[in-house]
């Protein structure tokens, strides 16, 4: 019994020692984790202190820092962070107030705009209605990329110290989207010629950064201490001037500048394919097929639907553009908040054939035909293309081949420049391959106005949206417009270009933006 008691006590001691050991081990682990957490926090503090607050950019073929006069792409991009408009656009192209505090459409052609006069210029003076009037009046007298924005303004009246009235020569749907041009200081140009004055070397602005130096080879921007509407990480931006784009690309390749933007589909031939971060944003150049919906055959929406599904857009992009374009079906499919839900327009010859068969078309005698209104209708139409545009001719050839695979007969009309313009202006075509530079405005009257599509509901909605300011209602109406578009297929969207944003791997933050403002997220950029 004594032996058993000793053994029992011994086992208890071993168990107690084991438990104590576990407690010590757990305590040690907890202490190590706490130590590691402290070390990480200290490391993070060091990293925060080591964040680079200066970046380097480039401008090729510099002209002027006056944003109303400049025709330079890089200047127009960079001046978005120096000067501000009455209204600006968000990342999804929604209009928001900037220098304007409030606005109202008081009649078809009249607008009241209240200015936020608490905003300061970088020299410390307050923004005034006189600055806005000064800008618009000078803009109307010069050759500017923004001239079209104010073309319909016939009068600008000062209502009071913070309000102006704009009167247009006609109703312009969504005119407020035109008021996105930069506003300049009247005082800054007092006694000077607007085009040749010395202030154009470094015009003051209300934006996030200000020009502190503009020499023959570089421009330096620093934080605008009077800008109070955001916390900025970057404190200095050095902009080098280059004689040509190739020189600027080479400088980026060597790491001398941190970011470039381009829609050059051959950019990789200049900067290579590795050693930098790449982001893409939708471009503005949109190619599509315009359709004469009054044509006896093309008036049938199932024919238009079938044509759309029979076109291999991806193959065209690969063959013609080397994969450097994107498929696009609709005029707002560049990321616009009003674009609505996309339809399936992917290439499928079988689907195209099925659509025709389901709607009474019969493939007979090597052609699609249907007996309609006492006569046999045959799907056989002409596709007009501009002969001098070799790229579009190549596209048209592929489209013709695609459609013929589905049994759809097409005759290409390769028109001279004058003939092509006449076809386009007079709508004297069955179908025409064309394209547009897309607007920042969601106004679709260019495409759906003038009876281009006989749809009473669509016409009614188009009249309604001109005067809707409530976002949820506007979105509801545009959702319905897209549904009608998807069903009716009054146009056949093909593809659009895109911008490539190449950045140094040490540049951090949310770099992708949109083609309105690549610096829209600059608040959180930094170097690491």
What do the PLM-derived regions correspond to, one by one?
Residues 73, 94, 179-232, 236, ...:
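Gly/Pro-rich hinge or "lid" segments in bacterial periplasmic/extracellular proteins
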Residues 327-365, 388-393:
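Structural transition elements
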